[in-house]
């Protein structure tokens, strides 16, 4: 199978009736015949009688070229390339209609803020950011007007303690006190009956002690030592101790200097003098 047969089978054209290659079969002529054809201005192809000769049987799909009077060369063929090119042009022209939608898809985001959901005048930034504000104001993004929100009762905060991962160890490791409602209670009667223990939260206690020692030498030679102790409860204890410093009397002669060991006479005097003194 030739390359031309493979090409025609790929595009669905019927097979040839002969094994002659139409691309180059009609071009394998003598040089003299080519010159004669050029002089006569004829064309080589299906219109040429030599093309329909028994030596060159006609085929369903032919290929040829002709010389125009102006000196140009024009190729013509019956392989169906014109239809093929026309089909490709129609396909690529239709691709222009395969455009994206005119409106791009909108990404999910926060809804537009309405005037009723804006920060109300006089409301603190903390209340606007908290899910359950401390001042029991209605939620900003709830879509409820201020006049309607005033008549509603504040929603209690949910008990998130039971949903914590280590809520089973609260009795061993107490982390946060239990949530209590924010309301005014009369504590006078409760304190008079139960005392301050149940009312006040237990506070951790720490014990420490600070000790500072200061020594001062006065001009008369007395050394004063001041010791200050401060405990965790703020009690301060200061102890002052005075004693005289060790000093030699002023009228005493100069104390003898130790002999230098590098002097041989001094070493002999040291040993011999002691021996003679002991005698």
Curated annotation (Swiss-Prot):
Region annotation (Involved in PLN binding) ranges: 203-225
| One Gene Ontology molecular-function label | interleukin-1 binding
N-acetylserine PTM sites in chain numbering = 2
Q: What does the UniProt entry say about where the protein is found?
A: Mitochondrion matrix; Endoplasmic reticulum; Nucleus membrane; Cytoplasmic vesicle
Q: Give start-end positions of Basic and acidic residues composition bias.
A: 115-124, 167-184, 217-255
| Region of interest (Involved in HCLS1 binding), residue spans | 114-279
Region (Involved in GNA13 binding) residue ranges read 176-247
* Gene Ontology BP annotations: cellular response to cytokine stimulus; granulocyte colony-stimulating factor signaling pathway; negative regulation of apoptotic process; positive regulation of granulocyte differentiation; positive regulation of phosphatidylinositol 3-kinase/protein kinase B signal transduction; positive regulation of transcription by RNA polymerase II; regulation of actin filament organization; regulation of actin filament polymerization
Q: What is its main location?
A: mitochondrion
Q: Where is the composition biased (Acidic residues)?
A: 30-41
Q: Which disease is it linked to?
A: Neutropenia, severe congenital 3, autosomal recessive: A disorder of hematopoiesis characterized by maturation arrest of granulopoiesis at the level of promyelocytes with peripheral blood absolute neutrophil counts below 0.5 x 10(9)/l and early onset of severe bacterial infections. Some patients affected by severe congenital neutropenia type 3 have neurological manifestations such as psychomotor retardation and seizures.
Under the heading PANTHER family, the entry gives: HCLS1-ASSOCIATED PROTEIN X-1
Write the protein's name.
HCLS1-associated protein X-1
Organism equals Homo sapiens
